[in-house]
Amino acid sequence: DIQMTQTTSSLSASLGHRVTITCSASQDISNYLNWYQQKPDGTVKLLIYYTSRLHSGVPSRFSGSGSATDYSLTITNLQQEDXATYXCQQGNTLPYTFGGGTKLXIKR
């Protein structure tokens, strides 16, 4: 199985600031990388698919980049509602595996 690694398990940033969350794959996943957001109430939403394509309804404050084995999610102009856990998933090879998640806390 392809191993997905998010080296930062938690981070905090201030309202209005920018954060970047990284994810690495144990082998080339050819840009088949998705980012999910899990809110504290358990709600899960797809944010970005195929590295950089924004899912319908997701604000343009969210963006993704990367290639081969290294990927990132950037959130600009942080809002209180961005407090959540963000996880990457590779969709290149079954089973489609997830990173361990990065929990983001927003400082007022």
Swiss-Prot record:
Residues 1-23 are annotated as: Framework-1. It comes from Mus musculus. Residues 98-107 are annotated as: Framework-4. One of its GO terms (cellular component) is immunoglobulin complex. Residues 57-88 are annotated as: Framework-3. Anti-2-phenyl oxazolone (PHOX) Antibody. CDD domains: IgV_L_kappa (cd04980). GO terms for biological process: adaptive immune response; immune response. Residues 89-97 are annotated as: Complementarity-determining-3. SUPFAM superfamilies: Immunoglobulin. Keywords: Adaptive immunity, Disulfide bond, Hybridoma, Immunity, Immunoglobulin. Disulfide bonds join C23-C88. This is Ig kappa chain V-V region NQ5-89.4. Gene3D superfamilies: Immunoglobulins. Residues 24-34 are annotated as: Complementarity-determining-1.
